[in-house]
Amino acid sequence: MRKSFILLFACICTLLASCSTEQTPTRADRIRTQLLTCDESSVIVVAHRADWRNFPENSLEAIQSSIDMGVDMLELDVQRTKDGVLMLMHDHNLDRMTNGSGDIAETTWEEFSKLNLKDHQGNLTEYKVPTLEQALLLCKDRIMINLDKADRYFDEVFALLDKTGTGNLIVMKGGQPAEQVKEKFGKYLDRVIYMPVVTINNAESEQAIQAFLDELKPVAFELCYSNAESPVPAKMKTTLKGRSLIWYNTLWASLCAGHHDDLAVEDQDGTYGYMIDTLGARILQTDRPQLMLEYLRSRKLHE
């Protein structure tokens, strides 16, 4: 009897140990799965340059604020210093965002470390310019990242992804035709999510989208349009249904035919709602992530 009890206890311990080693999907994993499975049950919110209204754009503090807010993905801009350090900044020079001046490509990381960031009103803050590696580690398991301007440094970016174990976080985008994408980035396409960016103001854009569907079968397309009379955006809702998610930008009027963030302050249904209901958007990039999240939650389109 005693031996049977010991054997049973050992089996239970083994079972519990095996269960504990099974990895629970992280928040980033869940968002990635939504992309890969073309799940249209909710809307993915992308914060443009992170939460730049409350902290300097592309800063660690803006990233953390976005995570706390419940944002799903960040758009972050990558530059490289004179001594080869990949860091976050939109502009190619220091003037607008720091208390320094000159080109980033002519500035060493040591020189960067002495600078402070400015907020969106030009006020100097105590916050520092982050490296890409710092940002990746902060985002790990917590939020997806769309790296902008990073295709110039693909090999170096991937070395950092391997080092930090964050390859599952990354979305890369570009405006090149499908054949060029395969030729230039082919060895990476099975490791990260790649989304084509297509301006859909004319019929030629439909051919470009079809080429991507045939060649790469992307999980999503970023679509831009400025002509409110164009029939193509509504047509894309049908064309891409069940095949690829649709990403639109509500940052300014020329990207979304006037259905932009500033108008959403007074009319979310006519802006965000229009992009979702009429055009089939399931990924929206915004400069007002808190406003967008509140609207989506009111419609049960976001957790």
Q: Which functions belong to the PLM regions below?
A:
Residues M1-A28:
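Bacterial Sec-dependent N-terminal signal peptides
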